[in-house]
Protein backbone atom coordinates (compact mmCIF):
# COMPACT_ATOMS: atom_id res chain seq x y z
CA UNK A 1 0.00 0.00 0.00
CA UNK A 2 1.57 3.27 -1.12
CA UNK A 3 1.47 6.55 0.75
CA UNK A 4 1.74 10.06 -0.64
CA UNK A 5 1.60 13.57 0.77
CA UNK A 6 -1.17 15.98 -0.15
CA UNK A 7 -1.39 19.62 0.85
CA UNK A 8 -4.61 21.55 0.39
CA UNK A 9 -3.20 25.03 -0.21
CA UNK A 10 -4.29 28.36 1.32
CA UNK A 11 -6.48 29.35 -1.65
CA UNK A 12 -8.62 26.21 -1.37
CA UNK A 13 -8.81 26.41 2.43
CA UNK A 14 -9.95 30.05 2.17
CA UNK A 15 -12.62 29.13 -0.43
CA UNK A 16 -14.02 26.46 1.89
CA UNK A 17 -13.57 23.52 -0.47
CA UNK A 18 -11.48 21.28 1.82
CA UNK A 19 -14.35 18.81 2.28
CA UNK A 20 -15.00 18.62 -1.47
CA UNK A 21 -11.32 17.92 -2.15
CA UNK A 22 -11.13 15.26 0.56
CA UNK A 23 -14.24 13.64 -0.94
CA UNK A 24 -12.41 13.38 -4.28
CA UNK A 25 -9.58 11.48 -2.61
CA UNK A 26 -11.82 9.15 -0.62
CA UNK A 27 -14.27 8.41 -3.44
CA UNK A 28 -11.33 7.42 -5.64
CA UNK A 29 -9.83 4.88 -3.26
CA UNK A 30 -7.38 7.01 -1.28
CA UNK A 31 -7.66 6.68 2.50
CA UNK A 32 -6.57 9.48 4.84
CA UNK A 33 -3.91 7.94 7.09
CA UNK A 34 -3.03 11.26 8.78
CA UNK A 35 -4.22 14.86 8.57
CA UNK A 36 -3.58 18.21 10.22
CA UNK A 37 -4.45 21.83 9.60
CA UNK A 38 -1.60 24.24 10.22
CA UNK A 39 -0.10 27.61 9.39
CA UNK A 40 3.28 27.17 7.69
CA UNK A 41 6.04 29.43 8.92
CA UNK A 42 8.27 31.12 6.35
CA UNK A 43 11.15 28.95 7.58
CA UNK A 44 9.17 25.71 7.13
CA UNK A 45 7.88 26.74 3.70
CA UNK A 46 11.41 27.59 2.56
CA UNK A 47 12.71 24.27 3.84
CA UNK A 48 9.85 22.23 2.34
CA UNK A 49 10.20 23.86 -1.09
CA UNK A 50 14.01 24.21 -1.05
CA UNK A 51 14.19 22.03 -4.18
CA UNK A 52 12.79 25.11 -5.98
CA UNK A 53 15.10 27.65 -4.28
CA UNK A 54 16.92 28.58 -7.51
CA UNK A 55 13.73 28.98 -9.54
CA UNK A 56 12.26 32.44 -10.17
CA UNK A 57 8.91 31.61 -8.52
CA UNK A 58 10.42 30.42 -5.20
CA UNK A 59 9.82 33.64 -3.24
CA UNK A 60 6.22 33.92 -4.43
CA UNK A 61 5.63 30.24 -3.64
CA UNK A 62 6.88 30.66 -0.07
CA UNK A 63 4.81 33.83 0.35
CA UNK A 64 1.69 32.12 -0.99
CA UNK A 65 2.11 28.96 1.10
CA UNK A 66 2.39 31.07 4.26
CA UNK A 67 -0.56 33.34 3.38
CA UNK A 68 -3.08 31.22 5.26
CA UNK A 69 -3.67 27.79 6.77
CA UNK A 70 -3.09 24.57 4.85
CA UNK A 71 -4.38 21.03 5.36
CA UNK A 72 -1.61 18.45 5.16
CA UNK A 73 -2.53 14.79 4.68
CA UNK A 74 -1.00 11.38 4.17
CA UNK A 75 -3.07 9.58 1.56
CA UNK A 76 -2.83 5.81 1.32
CA UNK A 77 -3.92 3.40 -1.39
CA UNK A 78 -2.90 1.39 -4.42
CA UNK A 79 -0.67 3.54 -6.66
CA UNK A 80 -1.34 6.48 -4.32
CA UNK A 81 1.27 8.81 -5.86
CA UNK A 82 0.02 8.41 -9.43
CA UNK A 83 -3.65 8.34 -8.44
CA UNK A 84 -3.30 11.56 -6.43
CA UNK A 85 -1.51 13.31 -9.29
CA UNK A 86 -4.23 12.23 -11.72
CA UNK A 87 -6.93 13.54 -9.38
CA UNK A 88 -5.08 16.86 -8.96
CA UNK A 89 -4.66 17.53 -12.68
CA UNK A 90 -2.06 19.70 -14.43
CA UNK A 91 -0.21 22.34 -12.40
CA UNK A 92 -1.77 25.06 -14.55
CA UNK A 93 -5.54 24.81 -13.99
CA UNK A 94 -6.15 26.11 -17.52
CA UNK A 95 -4.45 22.92 -18.79
CA UNK A 96 -6.03 20.59 -16.20
CA UNK A 97 -8.51 18.03 -17.47
CA UNK A 98 -12.18 18.62 -16.67
CA UNK A 99 -13.21 17.04 -13.40
CA UNK A 100 -9.77 17.28 -11.79
CA UNK A 101 -9.27 19.12 -8.51
CA UNK A 102 -7.31 21.94 -10.14
CA UNK A 103 -9.77 22.36 -13.01
CA UNK A 104 -12.62 22.63 -10.51
CA UNK A 105 -11.06 24.55 -7.59
CA UNK A 106 -7.79 26.27 -8.58
CA UNK A 107 -7.52 29.97 -9.38
CA UNK A 108 -4.17 30.15 -11.18
CA UNK A 109 -0.87 28.37 -11.74
CA UNK A 110 0.26 29.76 -8.37
CA UNK A 111 -2.98 29.40 -6.41
CA UNK A 112 -3.57 25.88 -7.71
CA UNK A 113 -5.42 24.37 -4.72
CA UNK A 114 -3.25 21.33 -3.98
CA UNK A 115 0.26 19.93 -3.75
CA UNK A 116 1.03 16.25 -4.21
CA UNK A 117 4.25 14.27 -4.02
CA UNK A 118 5.67 13.54 -7.48
CA UNK A 119 7.38 10.23 -6.63
CA UNK A 120 7.42 7.55 -3.94
CA UNK A 121 10.87 8.70 -2.84
CA UNK A 122 9.73 12.32 -2.48
CA UNK A 123 6.53 11.17 -0.76
CA UNK A 124 8.55 9.52 2.00
CA UNK A 125 10.64 12.67 2.50
CA UNK A 126 7.62 14.98 2.41
CA UNK A 127 5.57 12.82 4.79
CA UNK A 128 8.46 12.75 7.27
CA UNK A 129 8.68 16.56 7.07
CA UNK A 130 5.16 16.95 8.48
CA UNK A 131 4.35 13.76 10.38
CA UNK A 132 5.93 11.55 13.03
CA UNK A 133 5.43 7.83 12.37
CA UNK A 134 3.08 7.57 15.37
CA UNK A 135 0.73 10.13 13.77
CA UNK A 136 0.12 7.93 10.71
CA UNK A 137 -2.47 5.20 11.15
Curated annotation (Swiss-Prot):
How is this protein annotated for GO cellular component? cytoplasm
Required cofactor(s): Mg(2+)
Catalyzed reaction equations: a 2'-deoxyribonucleoside 5'-diphosphate + ATP = a 2'-deoxyribonucleoside 5'-triphosphate + ADP; a ribonucleoside 5'-diphosphate + ATP = a ribonucleoside 5'-triphosphate + ADP
Q: Name one GO molecular function term.
A: metal ion binding
| InterPro entries reported for this sequence | NDK-like_dom, NDK-like_dom_sf, Nucleoside_diP_kinase, Nucleoside_diP_kinase_AS
Query: An example of a Gene Ontology BP annotation on this entry?
Result: UTP biosynthetic process
NCBIfam families (alphabetical) = PRK00668.1
Explain the purpose of this protein. Major role in the synthesis of nucleoside triphosphates other than ATP. The ATP gamma phosphate is transferred to the NDP beta phosphate via a ping-pong mechanism, using a phosphorylated active-site intermediate.
Which named protein is this? Nucleoside diphosphate kinase
Give the source species.
Campylobacter fetus subsp. fetus (strain 82-40)
Amino acid sequence: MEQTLSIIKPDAVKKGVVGKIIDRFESNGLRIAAAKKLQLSVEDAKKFYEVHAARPFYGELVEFMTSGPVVVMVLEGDNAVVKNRELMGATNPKEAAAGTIRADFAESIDANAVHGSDSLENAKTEIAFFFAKREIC
